[in-house]
A protein has these predicted regions:
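Glycine-rich ATP-binding loops of the HATPase_c
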Residues: 178-184
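Short alpha-helical Gxxx[C/S/T] motif in the catalytic ATP-binding
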Residues: 166, 170
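Short conserved segments within the C-terminal catalytic ATPase subdomain
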Residues: 70-81
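Short conserved segment of the HATPase_c
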Residues: 141-153
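Short alpha-helical segment of the dimerization/phosphotransfer core of two-component systems
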Residues: 24-29
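Conserved micro-motifs of the catalytic ATP-binding
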Residues: 44-49, 90-93
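A conserved beta-strand-to-alpha-helix junction within the catalytic ATP-binding
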Residues: 50-68
Length: 192
């Protein structure tokens, strides 16, 4: 309906905005369906990983590349601080599932922390473990909601759209990789 509106086709800028709405809504619905399918597989034990050597930094960079232009169009700056790739050895994991985690967290940062108009991402090594940090500079998460944000279907007080299962799926994927998925309020504001 958006493109079929005769008023839009006369104005190229309005047409571009209409197409952007369609793309964003398609992406949102596709993500929601994928999350629901993954959640169903996790619940009945059909969720599996395709384990191989994975360059964690390259997977994060792919996710950043996927979202950078979308964020720019929404007025959100996405800063990336790469680690020293030579010092980050491959890990054993599922590259697609790890990229799914990064994309979901980046999307959440934009939805819930977008008011800060800035998101930063980094990868590095701490105490022998590879660590990926994604931070928004928005209002953060109310302290009373922090213990629940990774629970299935929990949406908190945020008005942002979503299924409420994305972070639960991310948490499960990271656990299946032997990792830890933490969410906290960042010093100086925002969440990471």
């Amino acid at each position: 309906e958006t493109i079929l509106d005769d008023d839009l086709t006369d104005d190229p800028e309005q047409l571009r905005r209409g197409i952007r709405v369609i793309v964003n809504e398609s992406r949102r619905l596709s993500t929601m369906v994928e999350e629901l399918l993954d959640f169903s597989k996790m619940e009945d034990g059909r969720f599996t990983l395709q384990i191989e050597d994975v360059d964690l930094q390259a997977e994060l960079e792919d996710a950043i590349f996927t979202y950078q232009e979308l964020f720019r169009q929404d007025g959100i700056a996405l800063e990336y601080h790469p680690g020293d790739g030579d010092l980050l050895p491959p890990i054993r994991g599922d590259s697609e599932r790890l990229k799914q985690v990064f994309c979901n967290v980046l999307d959440n940062a934009a939805k819930h922390g977008g008011a800060g108009r800035r998101i930063s991402a980094s990868v590095g090594q701490e105490s022998g473990c590879q660590v990926v940090r994604i931070r928004d500079y928005g209002p953060g998460i109310p302290e009373e909601e922090l213990p629940f944000v990774k629970q299935k279907f929990y949406k908190g007080t945020s008005r942002a759209r979503g299924s409420g299962i994305g972070l639960a799926v991310c948490d499960e994927i990271v656990k299946l990789h032997g990792g830890t998925f933490t969410i906290s309020n960042a010093i100086g504001g925002g969440a990471e």
